[in-house]
Amino acid sequence: MAAALAFCGCKKEPAATGVGTSAAPSGEAIKVGEFASLTGKEAAFGQSSHKGTLLAVDELNAAGGVLGRKLELITEDNRSVAGESATVVRKLISRDKVVAILGEVASSRSLEAAPICQQNQVPQISPSSTNPKVTETGDYIFRVCFIDPFQGAVLAKFAHRSLKAKKVALLTDVASAYSVGLAKYFRDQFTDDGGQVLLEQKFNGGDKDFKAQLTAIKASGAEAIFAPCYYTEAGLICVQARQLGLSVPIFGGDGWEAPELIQIGGKSMEGTYYSTHYSAEDASPAVQSFVAKFKARFNETPDAMAALGYDSAYVLADAMKRAGNTDGPKVRDALAATKEFAGVTGKTTIDAKRNATKGLVFMTVKDGQFKYVETINP
């Protein structure tokens, strides 16, 4: 399924063959590609990120566009299916002739696309893929979020400091690069700080029954459970843990960030914690302005994926303006030089490895609502 979203009223160009990164002709709309999980098991991620990107592009066009030209956002749905991201990104580059790519949320899907973007010298910005391997692909690959070595270390210290846990169990999705990586970084920091990881139970994304793993965790005597997975499994894990009488704290990373988490987990989510990139409760004028505009447009409160999607579009637009055109190498150089760009998820500075230096936000579930706990800065 593909959705082409044009904001300029221009006639769409016929399909083209071949690849390359020549700048868009002056006066024509600037074509920007986006790939996201708009359908399938992780659709909440893709839909939130897409809405944020859509809002940003709409605002940019209303303000006159970029370099005096409108932006045309061409969005492809990878259906949450492994392998599909590579297919749609090839299409965006070869047929649609986009000058840059925004996406994806999931690290495994960004990793599918990154070699293709790198080979074709098309800058790619991931809004929220936190696995460090994503940007290691090459110098055309960027992100506007923190990375998992930082997230894992902060989560480990949170377990010690706030949860008072000295012995933990891990529940890891072995089919997810994000989950495996975040588990590793958590484990390294937690054990370095004197804690014990009593056992690591494993599952595959899409599993529905976690009772065997949770029974083993219960028998281990773990004082907390770290589940670095996506919201689709996190909610079920919490439900089944409580059904088995496990009352210890359960916590996770930014993969938990979705309104559907509470819909899936219900009352079992009470008292759980997760790390993320921003909070809609932030009182800063920039955040509250974004929240108000997002609610007016989509009739819902924007989550972190929406905020990062929004920021990724603005970071790209800023780089194009500083580059003075849409040529791939020049936009790449401008992205690499991004410093203190003010967005709704904080100030974005791109480091030498094309990662963003950003703070981390902790959220909890209280009375069936997501509530802000604290912000930890690098």
Where does each model-flagged region fall?
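Short, low-complexity disordered leader/linker segments with a strong preference
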Residues: 1-31, 62, 377-378
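An alpha-beta-alpha
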Residues: 141-205, 224, 316
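Segments of small-molecule ligand-sensing domains
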Residues: 296-306, 317-370
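Hydrophobic alpha-helical segments within soluble ligand-binding/sensing domains
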Residues: 85, 144-167, 180-182, 208-211, ...
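Extracytoplasmic "Venus flytrap"
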Residues: 24-52, 76-83, 105-106, 171-180, ...
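Extracellular/periplasmic bilobed ligand-binding domains
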Residues: 117, 182-275
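Beta-alpha junction/loop-to-helix N-cap segments that form part of ligand/metal-binding clefts
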Residues: 15-20, 44-51, 63-135, 203-210, ...
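Extracellular/periplasmic periplasmic-binding protein-like sensory domains
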Residues: 238-310, 324, 364-377
